[in-house]
Amino acid sequence: MKKDRFYKERVKILGGPGCGKTTRLLKVLKTYLDNGLAPDQALMVGFANATVDNLRERCEKEFNYSSIQTDSIKTIHKYCLDHLDEYKILSVADKKEFKKKLKTDPENWIKINTPEYDEEDQQETFATWNGIEDGKVGLILNIVSLARHNRLKNWDKGLDELMEYYDKCYVGGFEYKIHRDEVQYVYTQYEHFKKQNSLIDFEDMLHKALHPDIIFDYYKLLIVDECQDLSKLEWKVIAKLSKNSEDLYLAGDDDQAIFGWKGSDVRIFQNWPVRKREILPYTHRLPRKIYNLAQALTGHILKRMGNNYKVKKDEEGVLKHIGQLEEVENKIKVGANMIMCARSWNKCEHFVRYLKDIGLVWQEKTTQQEGRKFTSSVSTSVKNIINNWNKLQKGEGIKGTEVMKLIKEFKEDLVVYGKKTALINTNLCPPEFLDETKLFTFSMLKEKYFVLADIKKSWFDIFIFKSQRIVTTKRPYALYEDREDYNNYLKRAYELDPTFKKTDILVSTIHGVKG
């Protein structure tokens, strides 16, 4: 099929914070759509999930995109993953299994039973590695990740490339001393584990999609957002996409390039050849004091594309220094809408402990990368169990699968002795529990299913929830002292806001907020 070479644009759009890059990109898309371009002939890719979610929502609202049409808006990793059907993503359960097997001889891996994991671990969520959660193994695999984003010439010789990168770039600063032989061992076993189980991680998605046998689709319009955050490896994917696309629009702000620590290389964006460069002239978000601070800082950036813009808002804004959170405690309350951020997560811990002590719900993003979003301090599973208990108190019925989750979190002696396991295990439970059409009231549970709990009591007197953030010998600085401490926090939060939804406080590193 002969390609239609009607489109030949190569454009770079620069815009500071609040200058309307997304709005400008959507105007570009609208022009093409108005001229007859079909939605599936335009691909929009971004660095982070937040970027993609925003683009999808706006295309649904402004262009009446269907759920099928929004499938042409995705992260770079998701685009690559969609071309790798024969692989499974490395999940949290897979990560735990690897860490367990790493302590044994690979020859004996086949003899090790796969352990049972929580329901959340079993879900297809991307697993990420970090030193806080995974210790030295996480730090080593972060080195591997950085190497793969930076060493592209011959990664088929992965171990050699990795060790060359390690020898050239590794300097101290880690909590643990990492030796050469440890890096070699963990990398070798990690690759063996992934191959044995047909698994891929974030870097594999990109690397394997670059293989010549993987054919990318043809697009008349390719739009790439947040270009300043892309690594060399991600730019390789963009290069492959652009070779098979007619028009290319690159949007970003090199002044906001703060992901160099994870392999991003803003110089590629700065030097990428285009026919036209467009600078968005005004920020509609920043008040004057914040704008002035940002402008003062840009003078310290050695190389930039000259993305100069003016402030549009009349408001001055507030810029203050505080010594402790108590100075703004009148603003930190139910209904607050704010971001608490710091350069590193250990600085954010202070925010989290403060919010925990006063009983406010918050969302956080710690060292997780592209695969994770902000997670609430009160999990969805906890909220659902509390809501279901409230339903039972009103005389309403709930599904059998919800009954099983509810009974699992009961305190001791609230089920007839010896019956609890049979009620919460899918292989042993009453078959009617698995019937999605049936509902069970509390009177039914009490009469037929050995439940001894008092329906008149508050959920706090019935359940004892678990948390992975309770102090142990391996986690001496975890957030909660014990399960009682965690459940007391849940009680305080519920008493302030039974919906757990009124407060919108984000706690994150600066990088996490931006991503």
Can you say where each PLM-predicted feature lies in the sequence?
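Conserved helicase motor core of SF1/SF2 NTP-dependent helicases
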Residues: 16-21, 27, 47-50, 221, ...
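Conserved P-loop NTPase-based nucleic-acid remodeling module centered on helicase motor cores
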Residues: 41, 46-144, 358, 363-370
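Conserved two-lobed SF2 helicase motor
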Residues: 72-75, 201-209, 503-511
